[in-house]
Amino acid sequence: MGVHPQLNKNGELQHLLTTEGLPAVILRHILDTAESFTGVTERDVKKIPLLRGKSVFNLFFEPSTRTRTTFEIAAKRLSADVINLNMAVSSQTKGETLLDTVDNLSAMHADMFIVRHNQSGAAHLIARHVRPEIHVINAGDGWHAHPTQALLDMFTIRRYKQDFHALRVAIIGDILHSRVARSQIHALTTLGVPEIRVIAPKTLLPAKVERLGVHVYHNMVQGLQDVDVLMMLRLQHERMESAHLPSTEEYFKYYGLTPEKLALARSDAIVMHPGPMNRGVEIDSEVADGTQSVILPQVNFGIAVRMAVMSILAGN
């Protein structure tokens, strides 16, 4: 492989593992390709033959409904054969190693692995291990990265705001446990967003988060002033220790997005959420269902973005 673990020797995308270090030209190419696929979802026949004859294996070692479903829909729209494996109850529980599992599936002529795992670095490990004709997409690994979520977020921002170069973007909530936040920050920076803010209590921020080039706020009143894009994050109770948080009610009081807090941002600001959403914890229903929310379009764009990634990896 080339200088970057995701690129081949020609500088083309070989795997999608993280947004960190991905060149802007590749990020833009994915977004442009996704734009060309949005029309497919509007057609009577929602299929194009770009992945016909290819086998795509969904390896989800962590539960997921939305991400797994959108990957499956995206692959099927490209005419791929999709094999869904519930890894949580399969060979892994019988003691087979991750790479043994991958070797066995590779022997079944897999062309692409879509991997979600609770261990950071799992997708990188698989990418280093597989034959060069097999492509790996990271669908979320531990606290580390979730690149396709960040890409669909970038696509959504570009749809509503056109240009990245004059935006103030705030990421609000459980930054500490969020692989989405890390991927968003890397993508926003690469695409030229001049000001990225993170707003969270100190207990929900990673150490030295400022090194990522973000402005840190612990207060919504200050942090939301003149913001163009609000990216809400859920509290990840499954990755959290009780010490991180007094109560969800108290969290909502200070960090939940209400109409009153949203009014501090720009009047044309958009509200995003990667899902699943906890109403009454990080976001008020009135905001989630309101005119500034783009949460449902985000989900829809996820299909086109994942189609784009798979299509580019397959050499189209």
UniProtKB/Swiss-Prot annotation:
GO process annotations (BP): 'de novo' pyrimidine nucleobase biosynthetic process; 'de novo' UMP biosynthetic process; amino acid metabolic process
UniProt-annotated binding residues for carbamoyl phosphate: 66-67, 116, 146, 149, 275-276
Residues that, per the record, bind L-aspartate: 94, 179, 234
Protein keywords: Pyrimidine biosynthesis, Transferase
Catalysis: reaction(s): carbamoyl phosphate + L-aspartate = N-carbamoyl-L-aspartate + phosphate + H(+)
Matches recorded under InterPro entries: Asp/Orn_carbamoyltranf_P-bd, Asp/Orn_carbamoylTrfase, Asp/Orn_carbamoylTrfase_sf, Asp_carbamoyltransf, Asp_carbamoyltransf_Asp/Orn-bd
Pathway connected to this protein: Pyrimidine metabolism; UMP biosynthesis via de novo pathway; (S)-dihydroorotate from bicarbonate: step 2/3
EC number(s) stated in the UniProt entry for this protein: 2.1.3.2
Enzyme class: transferase
Keyword tRNA-binding: no
GO terms, molecular function: amino acid binding; aspartate carbamoyltransferase activity
Gene3D superfamilies in the record: Aspartate/ornithine carbamoyltransferase (3.40.50.1370)
Cellular component GO terms, alphabetical: cytosol
PROSITE patterns: CARBAMOYLTRANSFERASE (PS00097)
Lineage: superkingdom: Bacteria
HAMAP family: Asp_carb_tr (MF_00001)
Main function: Catalyzes the condensation of carbamoyl phosphate and aspartate to form carbamoyl aspartate and inorganic phosphate, the committed step in the de novo pyrimidine nucleotide biosynthesis pathway.
Subunit architecture: Heterododecamer (2C3:3R2) of six catalytic PyrB chains organized as two trimers (C3), and six regulatory PyrI chains organized as three dimers (R2).
Family: Belongs to the aspartate/ornithine carbamoyltransferase superfamily. ATCase family.
Record's protein name: Aspartate carbamoyltransferase catalytic subunit
Species classification: Bacteria, Pseudomonadati, Pseudomonadota, Betaproteobacteria, Nitrosomonadales
Gene assigned in the entry: pyrB
